[in-house]
Amino acid sequence: MLIETVQLAVEENRHYTYPDIVVSCDPRDQHESRRLYHPLLIVEVLSPSTEAYDRGLKFNQYKKMPSLRHYLLVSQKTWLVEWYQLIEPGVWSHTALAEAADAVVIAELNLTLTLTQIYEDAGVAPMTAGFEAEEE
């Protein structure tokens, strides 16, 4: 797992991004210290300045990467994680997780994370019944 300072080669030698978290299990990436080519999981923490890009153009570029199976968008405003999973080539499911016990389960990584664990010590309040996302 690498965090934020690693380039992700979206289009080899043409376009690079800096995801907040990227995980690759591909042996071809094991000896890379600053650049990855075969992500399994990408996590982006949403901010007002990048949210539209993370949801739109960036995700469309990421979807073209054959190794990518999971894409997480993590809100900084409230407890909300949007989880995109590749079901079959070209088909992505979307799950919105908003309850403390809701969990991201990524079998390929033997990883289970509840929202409580994701937001522990983050200073972000759980979603309430009257929550409305702020307009950007």
Protein language model regions, located:
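C-terminal interaction segment
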Residues: 3-65, 73-136
